[in-house]
């Protein structure tokens, strides 16, 4: 049973991860691979709204996706977007990235190899990773405008969609930790962390929501 205090702290981290960017037309949309097909669905919706003429889906597989997405996250995203009416010619697949940094670097390399001019990117991620994705993208590709979006959901609705409240809170704590650790390792830009967010993070760690934490000397994940 998860207490009301834990839920309140998780909500603070959830809200902090939301960047609050308003989608507008960009040169390209990049959908970051994961277990969550909602990223592909949101990217497809944005395409149909005219927010980007080209989509890059990026991602190999991970320990959480190798069984349900055996052809790779990017390929499963592509298939879902095509099911939703996105033309195959509008989709590029980057199948090798295994972390957020590689998502950005390899997508950039793919677009540059194709000679596609990029001045702005619609970056589509899971709801609890908007800020992490933004900080990584700004570090690795600083000379373009980044507009971060995700599926519009409340925390309770997202937990219901995943079916595992503890896992979602673990992932929130892990995303928050990376915002603090990775800038020191050169993986992200530094962002100010408000005191209430730090307090919520420490409370959740103290309650054992630690399965998605990384050692502070670990490579990027």
Swiss-Prot record:
Function statement: The imp locus inhibits the extrachromosomal maintenance of the streptomyces plasmid SLP1. May function as a transcriptional activator.
GO molecular function: DNA binding
Similarity field: To E.coli YdcF.
Identification of the protein by name: Uncharacterized protein SCO4629
Taxonomic superkingdom: Bacteria
Tagged with keyword NAD: no
UniProt cross-references to PANTHER family, sorted A to Z: DUF218 DOMAIN-CONTAINING PROTEIN, INNER MEMBRANE PROTEIN, PROBABLE PERMEASE
Keywords, sorted A to Z: DNA-binding
Organism per entry: Streptomyces coelicolor (strain ATCC BAA-471 / A3(2) / M145)
DNA-binding region: 77-96
